[in-house]
Amino acid sequence: MRTTSIMKKPSLKFLISIAAITVISIGVSGVLTAPRYKIAANAPAYDYSKLQKEKLGRGVVAIRENQSEVAVSWRYLSSDPVNTSFNLYRDGKKVAEVPATTGTFYRDTYGSKKAATYTIKPVVNGAETGHIEGSYTLPANAPTGYINIPLDPPTDGTTPAGQKYTYIPNDASIGDVDGNGEYEIILKWDPSKANDNAHDGYTGNVFFDCYRLTGERLWRIDMGRNIRAGAHYTQFMVYDFDGDGRAEIIMKTSDGTIDGQGNIIGDASADYREPGDPTQPTGGDFDKEDPRGKPRQGDPLRNQGRILTGNEYLTVFNGLTGAAMKTIDYIPERGQLEDWGDNRANRSDRFLAAVAYLDGGHPSPVMCRGYYTRAVLAAFDWNGKELKQRWVFDSNTPGNEAYAGQGNHNLRVGDVDGDGCDEIIYGSCAIDNNGKGLYSTGMGHGDAIHLTKFSPTMKGRQVWDCHENKRDGSSFRDAATGKVLFQVKSGTDVGRCMAADIDPTNPGVEMWSWESKGLRNIKGEVINPDIESFSTNMAVWWDGDLLRELLDKNVVSKYDWKAGVCKPLATFTGAASNSGTKATP
């Protein structure tokens, strides 16, 4: 097994701000004053007594902050009484009593380089309750500022065209796969030879690993040669779908996929990759005026490496073992390529996925296909033995035509109409929890979207979206009805937008985009015209106050509302992000 040291790639570094994990921080007192709001009606109406929940433990984490201090964080659980405080032990000796009013966080003075085990015990009315304790062992010679997880990369490979490739860690998700109440990491490995849907060419195989935080690998899934590598092809849902306390993984597979136990799904000999057509021009699938489509020497043959035919499956994998538990034909099925807008699988192989509580009680995987033209969403239920279809929404169904071409590169899930069930915000449209169309704004495809309650005084939830059509720019709408609350039109492709509460002097969440002409409030008013220093990729809770910070690549920045600019708060040298300009952490 190949392993990697702390400073060599690939190793997974968790750069964790312990203060950001707790809502309450001493940094809040005297700095921010929460306005007194009258809460608006029609908020999400989940019945939490019926909602299937994860069976999580304390999630204790200890990270060395400097040579003399260790930061310890843990979870406050929904089952904890509101007056729960905590006793913190190091190697069996109590080192702190943490009051209920100071959050689930403590800095311990500990300068030794030896390993130390931190244990958390909840306390109610002065007595330890024994209710869900937790512990974490800080390793000897622990690095400062992060947790290092050694990884085992897949073996390098060579495509049928003779192109060599290596492997890099890509997207990851978390889930409790063994039922111990703590998360494991499901990591996707992408080959260096991966392709966007617009590009021709062979790719390497995609792999998935499951790791404990110690670096122990539980299993590896090889997706096989019939699953193309690239950002849009494989969306993997990690969740406890059947309520047994252990997470499953649900994703699209094909003939030749090898599960975590070495079992092959379907026909191991099948190879659906196109060899390429030497009689056709090269250059990929781009508009004529796009310089990326200009043929260049060494370009792969037209359609080479694309998968235009062949079996597609939907598989449920056991989270603990990686074993395939159930495989069915994939829905939404490919069908005729032309039904999606082209014959090269650029449009048909745009996949999204989500987990949604469609019945208000149980989580359902929702697998989605297409957004530039035809869009199809299929919801399922997993009961531990059978994967049953709940509903399918298809924009090609008569009456659904307005929903075609409205999807984004991403989606959002939430109860937007107050019925206690989740709806799907699919770009510029919304799908109700029963699989029926809720509304379509007709503003089309975009690259970013945000769903939340932007202000306690506003009814329901809202959506901040940006659009690619060189017309609609950025729009703020009612999430339940699609009614546009304000809009900043633009004659360009608005590729990014962001929404986050970064300014305590302005009520509600702030919004901006590449073409918003400044930082805007919930009324659409410009409260800062200069947003040159603002990133538009990710927002995080980082420093322990009630505001959000911005994350772009390996830099966390914070808005200085007095100066009107964003300033770097932390830069993580040696850390990297995924997916190019999207900079997925």
Predicted segments — roles?
Residues A43-G57, Q67-E69, Y76, P99-P585:
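Beta-propeller-forming repeat regions
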Residues M1-L12:
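N-terminal secretory signal peptides that target proteins for export/translocation
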Residues V28-A41:
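Sec-dependent signal peptide cleavage junction
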Residues L12-V28:
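Sec-dependent N-terminal signal peptides
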Residues L77-D91:
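Solvent-exposed loop/turn segments flanking beta-strands in beta-repeat/beta-sandwich domains
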Residues A62-N66:
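Short, solvent-exposed loop/linker segments at the N-terminal edge
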Residues T3, Y37-I39, D91, A375, ...:
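Positively charged, low-complexity intrinsically disordered regions
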